[in-house]
Amino acid sequence: MTFDDLTEGQKNAFNIVMKAIKEKKHHVTINGPAGTGKTTLTKFIIEALISTGGTGIILAAPTHAAKKILSKLSGKEASTIHSILKINPVTYEENVLFEQKEVPDLAKCRVLICDEVSMYDRKLFKILLSTIPPWCTIIGIGDNKQIRPVEPGENTAYISPFFTHKDFYQCELTEVKRSNAPIIDVATDVRNGKWNYDKVVDGHGVRGFTGDTALRDFMVNYFSIVKSLDDLFENRVMAFTNKSVDKLNSIIRKKIFETDKDFIVGEIIVMQEPLFKTYKIDGKPVSEIIFNNGQLVRIIEAEYTSTFVKARGVPGEYLIRHWDLTVETYGDDEYYREKIKIISSDEELYKFNLFLAKTAETYKNWNKGGKAPWSDFWDAKSQFSKVKALPASTFHKAQGMSVDRAFIYTPCIHYADVELAQQLLYVGVTRGRYDVFYV
């Protein structure tokens, strides 16, 4: 690709980016709807920098899934922004806070390209700006109409600071480049406030199911396409609530795997939170991420068993039934093989959460001398990991990924307010490369 192959908007953004990198006076955010060539422009910028002898180029994404997509499409290895900034979980009483425990060495970083910047919250953005060296130029790429971030402990979503901060020059792409025109046309209208509608060209596009048998027809269509484990990777069902996601996963797993078991050997599952290992170097605790939030792992061994949980100062023990899974890295990520414990039953999860709530309440009102032993709370809580089956995910978890066919379950979207519902639907429609089905 040459400069002449770019759209006028891409050319303008490219020139602004190159000028910003040269002058080092401000950063740049490239904002654009789906199909306007943000990824193409990103790759072109990277290639131009490398071809002119540029060094210190780092690619970052806010999630593991987005990192994988960015690496594949740009042709250069990307990392999660949390790993680049060395952000790890810190516990305070019963809360987990993600903080920067050590300052990373970014002295060699000249250009930091951040993808999917609509997902960056204020705290992460603040850490980013305070960490980069003064000679580093940040190039943010995203779509300000996608799902907005919410600070931990808050209920109100807000637009990412990448689109509002005074130090970021705003470039907007408007000309559609992507070839899947029906999906882009519908996505553009959804982005502007409309609801989904059908549009199919040459057998591909957006199709909905309505009427009394809509859900049944939607699932029949899904199973006409998805028939095995291999088919799950490029076909994703999306819903708003975890309850809907779990129900859809249950239906799909029962059909595909012909089992009522929660987990089976050989199945690919998705981590719903990072798995850390903590060890000491020179007497100092160091945390290492084994599996990232959103990373795929394969089940090698699966056993349903039970264990007792207890905590100092809290009367009694609680018997918790759970799965012991041995899992391994799936795909081309660094290989690990680990044992994890999963509570899959709602009844057992309720019992475990009751124990945690009782422990937290006891420790908040600790009157037995000394500090409350919060380490017991976290030792118990960290015993268990959270995972989900591969077929279905929330819209939030799907943001940043791309699949051949997207299946959108909309009934539970109506629990969201109008603005969020529009963002959810927009993210759902733009996940599919060739087809989008909705009910």
Swiss-Prot record:
Keywords: ATP-binding, DNA replication, Helicase, Hydrolase, Isomerase, Nucleotide-binding
UniProt keyword annotation of Metal-binding present: no
Catalyzed reaction equations: Couples ATP hydrolysis with the unwinding of duplex DNA at the replication fork by translocating in the 5'-3' direction. This creates two antiparallel DNA single strands (ssDNA). The leading ssDNA polymer is the template for DNA polymerase III holoenzyme which synthesizes a continuous strand; ATP + H2O = ADP + phosphate + H(+)
EC number: 5.6.2.3
InterPro entries: AAA+_ATPase, P-loop_NTPase, PIF1_helicase, SH3_14
Binding site for ATP: G32, P33, A34, G35, T36, G37, K38, T39
Top-rank taxon, per record: Viruses
Top-tier EC class: isomerase
A single GO BP: DNA replication
GO molecular function, one term: helicase activity
Subunit annotation: Monomer. Interacts with UvsX and gene 32 protein.
UniProt function note: DNA helicase that stimulates viral DNA replication and recombination. Plays a role in T4 DNA replication initiation by selecting and activating DNA origins. Acts by dissociating and reassociating with the DNA molecule being unwound. Unwinds DNA as a monomer in a 5'-3' direction at a rate of 250 bp/s and can efficiently displace proteins from the DNA.
Record protein name field: ATP-dependent DNA helicase dda
Source organism (scientific name): Enterobacteria phage T4 (Bacteriophage T4)
Gene: dda
